[in-house]
């Protein structure tokens, strides 16, 4: 897959008020208009409907929705939950996505499943068990773990993946908690499917460096989920008064762990987990659209895979929750009316422009990163993406205040996109959360 890809996460329960596959299909043209390459579709499979609260995750209980159905605790890997629609609806949705020139990846939740899964009675050996025969329940998730030392289970899951690709039209998979499933299983499964579908897209919701060394295309790279993610780094800088140099530290830490594969990490500011956990403390609601745009400028130009949570493209301010649907919960779907506000229209224009720059820039796709020194390193993030053909300069004011910065190596710049940034003779004047992305004149081709 290309290094300049853009992923859009579509969570059915939050994407539309209806929360169905049919309703989502009607809005695929909208997603395509943003310049998205890959639609990441959250689980639509049959969920385990267990009313025993002791079997619910902590996040599920804290949601206050009292919804027994968790999209990440499944009962049937081949069936479509009636809440979302039918198998025909899935096929029609994937066809619509393909018609618009995009790929679609499905969520695989293989580490665990519900205790009422369709194979629970016929194949009890598929589950990991305690000595007394009870389900092995790992810390953190009160869900039964699956036993990947069982060859029949492996074949069952590989047949599931083949079905999702061949019958339902998936172009690949985002694999939930994939580090907790043996890597040799993923290696074998992907190799078998790629023999027929060599362009299969694979994403590990994990951090193991070995996983993106010839097995997965990309990974999340978030130790402890939140401790050292791109999101955590940017939130700390933008809202917790941490210095902008934290991004430099983030870069070096990832380079130490992943080497050149650090370019394979996803750069998300929100996803279904963080949006559900944050509720109304989301960056958009607390710190406003300018802070979000500052983070998205970096997320689209820094080495890695750009990632957009549904609703970010028009400043959504709704309380997203993966357990809230039309039957349970007080939280709403994303606020589509925001797309018609001045703020929402400006964000839509910004997203389309920054995505276009990302797609058409050789330096962003293939170039190395060079940090550019400035005289306010605690406030300003400044770097260049440099390829043989092109040099793209990026500078972002990460603080809610006006500043003037001087660059140690100022360039003659042709701005490609900017907001709240005025180029001076030897530096830049920034308004709060101002940014600039510019082509450095004389660096190669003169357009992006």
Stretch-by-stretch model annotation:
Residues 424-448:
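C-terminal beta-strand-rich structural cap/linker in extracellular carbohydrate-active enzymes
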Residues 1-22, 29-37, 43-168, 188-197, ...:
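Substrate-binding/active-site clefts of carbohydrate-active enzymes
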Residues 6-8, 39-41, 104-106, 173, ...:
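Hydrophobic faces of well-ordered beta-strands that scaffold small-molecule active sites
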Residues 25-37, 94-98, 251-258, 295-302:
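Short amphipathic alpha-helices and their capping/turn segments at secondary-structure boundaries
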Residues 41-49, 107-117, 176-182, 205-209, ...:
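Short, solvent-exposed turn/loop segments enriched in Gly/Ser/Thr/Pro and often Arg
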Residues 166, 176-261, 265, 315-353, ...:
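Active-site-proximal helices and loops of the catalytic beta/alpha 8
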Residues 2, 49, 259-412, 428-430, ...:
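Loop/helix patches that line or flank the sugar-binding groove of alpha-linked glycan CAZymes
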Residues 411-420:
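Short aromatic-acidic-glycine turn motif
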